[in-house]
């Protein structure tokens, strides 16, 4: 017979993989058309001039230019100028 009781199972030991969200190109940086500027969950940042919004709320450049972050009426916009 076993001389020690069986150990209890732990409910820890899990971790999800990181999603690599965040700002990929800073303000004042040059971007080419199609480059990702921000990966986000929801619209923390909104698309502005010459930038597009993907179905996962990714903001990307529609034209070559300089990234500009702008705040208007409590919303943060991303423009390509």
From Swiss-Prot:
Q: What residue spans carry the region label Disordered?
A: 1-24
Q: Which Pfam families match?
A: Ribosomal_L27 (PF01016)
One biological process term in Gene Ontology:
translation
Going by the UniProt record, its keywords in alphabetical order are: Ribonucleoprotein, Ribosomal protein
Q: Is Ribonucleoprotein included in the keywords of this UniProt record?
A: yes
* InterPro entries documented for this protein: Ribosomal_bL27 (IPR001684), Ribosomal_bL27_CS (IPR018261)
Gene Ontology molecular function terms on file: structural constituent of ribosome
Out of the domains of life, which is the source?
Answer: Bacteria
**Polar residues composition-biased segments:** 1-11
GO cellular component terms, semicolon-separated: cytosolic large ribosomal subunit
UniProt cross-references to SUPFAM superfamilies, sorted A to Z: Ribosomal L27 protein-like
Q: Which family does it belong to?
A: Belongs to the bacterial ribosomal protein bL27 family.
The protein's matches in NCBIfam families, at most eight in alphabetical order, are given as: L27
List, alphabetically, the HAMAP family matched: Ribosomal_bL27
Name of the featured protein: Large ribosomal subunit protein bL27
**Which lineage?**
Bacteria, Pseudomonadati, Spirochaetota, Spirochaetia, Spirochaetales
**Gene responsible for this protein:** rpmA
